[in-house]
Amino acid sequence: SHKTPTAEQPMIISADTVEQGYAFSNCLDDLLILEMAIKMHCPDYADDYDKYIKNGPNLYYSNGFIMKSEDYDRYCEFLFNCLNGYLKLADIKTEKDLVEHVKYNVEVGKYQRFADPKKVPAEAIKWQCSIGGFLSERLWTLWLQHNFKDERVLKLPYIKMEEKMYT
């Protein structure tokens, strides 16, 4: 049994920072709302947010990890405090609200990856409704770095079985 968390190898993103990478692939406003939620609900993470998300190049994708149950409980408390704070600030209460939130942000051109908001495929809208997963990858990176720093994490390779990107 491991005494330190185990996570997949962090990926160096194609942008200079985690925030810039998010802005290219998703709607930056969602990450900025999450930042507000973190500062409201977990203010002791604010400096590390700036260090690892605003200015850091490494992101732990896939939400994959193995850790002691006590650490898992602490992570889940942090994760859901932040995600629930995000949902409240974004005024997302239902799945319908989430879909409308994404559609609106696409229509007003808040996604850099979609050159023409009028030609975004329905599959891409559906994919972008995975905001909770996208944000939780950033939260996992933040929590892991805040609590364990890189040197205390056993990093293992992983295989991504399928990748489908919508442009």
Ranges and model annotations:
Residues 1-167:
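ER/Golgi luminal nucleotide-sugar-dependent glycosyltransferases, focusing on the catalytic module
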